[in-house]
């Protein structure tokens, strides 16, 4: 016999409580939840408002970043809400921070559109960061399952392919950013590129805010830059390049500029992080289809990545960008002018380069994660570095990195070409010493001094910048308790 409307409503009311119910009670907190291999996992640093229970705050993050709204709704009965609710399954107090908590949250894979960074982030960071019950919130780490990773293309080239193109193995790539950032004419800009490449660099690059300003329109820049690249390649017999920034106001214009870069012979283009995740993925697809290397400048990242209690940790950006398919990304120098704790920066580099991540709490890596054969993204070290730091750069950053000396090349008293030569000789000397088995880290200053005996430009660099360092306390360091078994 068919049930009446009144009877059906009575049964629904019996199994469904209306009104405002605590998130933890609604199912967004489940300490017994068994994490599935297919779950997307997120670790948040939660700072509840005074008087807010940390478990309820963590459940609220899970709810507001998945299926919840501020009150119970009837439509939940029309979905598999028990499946689609994100589950906060573990809450730990942050060591030495009594008002902060690490909240581990699991998301069912079906909550996310395949191959879309925009959709992934719309849930994970879309609305919850403005939640009033939280004083602050930071996304510290994520685990992306293999099934979801396989819906992304990843980098088109990666380290191995780029080395094969340049015929350069066993040492870092060497480059420089054209300075000043703004104001040069196209012809002078091209001359800077030529001088740097002629002096021994592999690449030069545009800076993040060089697009198409009145003093230098993009098409003229591209033509003069490629003239410099071709002349330097012919003079040195080496494969050279320059990162041409195609960032623009619209996707149509970026495609237009990228096509022009390819037409004039460039092997690499550049974009800025500020263009957004969808635009980044779109340009990555274009670069793959057109056999171009894609360099990403992380312009704007410190607005949300630097502060320890609120925003997004840069290691998460590294994961998203490797998924999106960029071939290069700026990832810190340790010794330069920009933010970068040595151990945390190592975690960034490992995230970009390793085929599989293990838990490493000092580096801020909270999850194991297999990269499902996605190619590596090459880290770029840029900002306040010079030849006298070469041994430290090799120690901290290894071989698979692009070392970008902007002021450390163009600020040389004897000219741009001399600055480039100084950096090239310094790099070759330190790499040779390492390969010969010398203690290149502790002997680094002596090794550079020996090399400078036969290289005047290097001696000038060492004399000029010998006292320059940026020794400031990092604002972002790892939070963990050292134990014999819990840390790597």
From Swiss-Prot:
A Pfam family matched in the record: RuBisCO_large
Subcellular location: Plastid, Chloroplast
Cofactor remark: Binds 1 Mg(2+) ion per subunit.
Secreted listed as a keyword: no
SUPFAM superfamilies: RuBisCo, C-terminal domain, RuBisCO, large subunit, small (N-terminal) domain
A GO CC term attached to the entry: chloroplast
GO molecular function terms attached to this record: magnesium ion binding; monooxygenase activity; ribulose-bisphosphate carboxylase activity
The keyword ATP-binding belongs to this UniProt entry's keyword annotation: no
Main localization (coarse): plastid
CDD domains associated with the record: RuBisCO_large_I
Residues that, per the record, bind Mg(2+): 205, 207-208
N6-carboxylysine modification, residue list: 205
Listed GO biological process terms: reductive pentose-phosphate cycle
Site (Transition state stabilizer): 337
PANTHER family: RIBULOSE BISPHOSPHATE CARBOXYLASE, RIBULOSE BISPHOSPHATE CARBOXYLASE LARGE CHAIN
Additional detail: The basic functional RuBisCO is composed of a large chain homodimer in a 'head-to-tail' conformation. In form I RuBisCO this homodimer is arranged in a barrel-like tetramer with the small subunits forming a tetrameric 'cap' on each end of the 'barrel'.
UniProt-listed NCBIfam families: PRK04208.1 (NF003252)
HAMAP family: RuBisCO_L_type1
Entry's family note: Belongs to the RuBisCO large chain family. Type I subfamily.
Free-text function comment from the UniProt entry: RuBisCO catalyzes two reactions: the carboxylation of D-ribulose 1,5-bisphosphate, the primary event in carbon dioxide fixation, as well as the oxidative fragmentation of the pentose substrate in the photorespiration process. Both reactions occur simultaneously and in competition at the same active site.
Subunit note: Heterohexadecamer of 8 large chains and 8 small chains.
Protein name per UniProt: Ribulose bisphosphate carboxylase large chain
Organism: Cyanidium caldarium
Gene: rbcL
